[in-house]
């Protein structure tokens, strides 16, 4: 029996999978075939989560969550099911599993394949996104999928990434806002208020982020 280990970085991403409260850094059974691990942001956290899931006996790994667009054609809500992951090396995706999932999606879902790039930190300018796109040829970027793909490759188990575009090329969260984000992606409201009061973040930018 296949057991899929889902690695998610953000609490909001976990809520897309289950309405249950998901603690950080703990294996949570979603159903008999799926377990979830809320890792927090970044490659190191995702790597540890994937390794723990492998030790727990999962037979395949998936990186689930959001991504930033590197292609101007991509819009928020588009779904990226990549062909490969561009990290330190070009990492494979289990295309049979990916294709099976893609064929089960609603025809209303905009699905994009191609390459998903890795970034060690959030990209906060259009210029940095376009530069990474030029270097990698990727259509989107995240901070965790490369780490999960590496663990899967080392364990010789299948891997896919499932990433929804959250910010287009022309808009990115301001760098100052990142200091107000907790490890699970939730907001430190007092820190955000302080940033607004000292005008580090225009209130219009927060409204644009929805």
Label the predicted regions.
Residues 15, 20-210:
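Glycine-rich phosphate- or other oxyanion-binding loops that anchor nucleotides, phosphorylated ligands
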